[in-house]
Amino acid sequence: MRVFGLDRISQIENMLRTFDVPSGFSIEGYFYNVIGLSQKKDDAVEIIEIKFNRTLGNYIKNLPLHHSQQILIDNEEEIRIRLKVIINEELINELIAYGDGAQVIKPKSLKNKIIKRAQLILENHKE
């Protein structure tokens, strides 16, 4: 299956061909374990833990990142959540956008991707 951004479609042409949806396929099921749209065929669901500062954490509590979101810790210092999702670019971009208000606790692989992206951001802004 391919996903195309509507903002990238400039012309539509009817090819007079039909497409049969595979038996048992559901669009909701296809996107059930992702934040955003992108995923690869063999991507696995992982358990993600993210620590948020109190201000950002309140926002995340009221507007969950994903339907799998569970609150693990909710105290004066932090709000920590657990997600069960596929790690993809949209998730990484979302976490980077939270800046120092979010910290990936688990898994180490996601934490390393965030660190690598942050290092690239620093490199791109050096004079």
Summary of predicted features, one role per range:
Residues 1-39, 45-48:
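Core beta-strand-centered patch of the WYL/Sm-like small regulatory domain
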Residues 32-127:
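Polybasic (Lys/Arg-rich)
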